[in-house]
Amino acid sequence: APRLENIGKRMQAVKMIHDLDTRFRLMDEFGNYGHVISLPNPPLEDITEPEVGANLARVANDAMAELVRKHPDRFPACVAALAMHDMDATRVELHRAIRDLGARGVQIFTNIAGKPLDIPKFQPVFDAMAEYDLPIWMHPARAATMADYASEERSRFEMWWCFGWPYETSVAMARLVFSGLFDRHPDIKIVTHHLGGMIPFFDGRLRPGLDVPGRPPPAEHPPAVLS
């Protein structure tokens, strides 16, 4: 896919992502250490058509479940990959991965081919995971083709990755909060990659930004979120 033209090169350079022997040697440096494994970048929605994406998700989940069976001391569990451009296929694979393969969660990305996670189309995934009481891993999805400025065609100097990924995570998570997800599912579990993006470090900025003196809160913000 054009917008992910460099991500394969980046992933290949991190050998422990795709080479088990390298990963095992690294894990051995930390003693009794295990990984809950997931499918790395790129998002399936960005590189495939819906039918192909659903097939790749099944192949990936079968392969990860097999790694867990072969190496339970290394990989105590896996989280399922989903291809979310076809929600009917997504629901089928979500239930299969958890019920049949023993996946202990699912991984999604901060946007689905440019669409935000908080729109109604994607809510069945959150509803299902709240029912299972299993976590959702949320990984940032942003490429160099998302420009830093409106006058440019692409991001420069790796800003899309260094700053873009934490921003992506923060916006996606904040919008899930303000959309009322945690009002509907107060016990839902979401694991954000990379220490939660910007949010844990921006408390002093978030509070005045969302609570401007003398201005009523935007109507779209649920009162419970701002209280």
Model regions and ranges:
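Helix-coil boundary/capping segments in enzymes
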Residues: 1-227
